[in-house]
């Protein structure tokens, strides 16, 4: 499974009502650090397939979801479990650090 694009319209269905924990990556095309972590998140989405869903929200095209969560900088990662935020992280990080962060929140 690869990362799933999510919009403001699909946020509740894909994230808050998900049966599995969800990592939400708030990003933008122009954001260098966002592009840096993209490949790592793609790999992690395959490694965690069936256990964790990783979704991407483009903040330029979908401003409501990041505003609702108070996102001020990107990349901003939020981990949802049972529809609630259990952890968040701002800024780029290597794949190993992202994997540790995801695992610690499960």
Curated annotation (Swiss-Prot):
GO terms for biological process: cell redox homeostasis. Pfam families: Thioredoxin (PF00085). The keyword Secreted does not apply. The keyword Transmembrane helix does not apply. It comes from the Bacteria. Disulfide bonds join 31-34. Residues 2-106 form the Thioredoxin domain. InterPro entries: Thioredoxin (IPR005746), Thioredoxin-like_sf (IPR036249), Thioredoxin_CS (IPR017937), Thioredoxin_domain (IPR013766). One of its GO terms (cellular component) is cytosol. Keywords: Disulfide bond, Electron transport, Redox-active center, Transport. One of its GO terms (molecular function) is protein-disulfide reductase activity. NCBIfam families: thioredoxin. PANTHER family: GEO12009P1 (PTHR45663:SF11). Participates in various redox reactions through the reversible oxidation of its active center dithiol to a disulfide and catalyzes dithiol-disulfide exchange reactions. Belongs to the thioredoxin family. This is Thioredoxin. It comes from Cereibacter sphaeroides. The gene is trxA.
């Amino acid at each position: 499974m690869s990362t799933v694009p999510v919009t403001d319209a699909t946020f509740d269905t894909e994230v808050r009502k998900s049966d599995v924990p969800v990592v939400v990556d708030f990003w933008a095309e122009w954001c260098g650090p966002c592009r840096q972590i993209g490949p790592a998140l793609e790999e992690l989405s395959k490694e965690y397939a069936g256990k964790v869903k990783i979704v991407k929200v483009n903040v330029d095209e979908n401003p409501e979801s990041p505003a609702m969560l108070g996102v001020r900088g990107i990349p901003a990662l939020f981990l949802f479990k049972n529809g609630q935020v259990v952890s968040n992280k701002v800024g780029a990080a290597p794949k190993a650090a992202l994997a540790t962060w995801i695992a610690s929140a499960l």
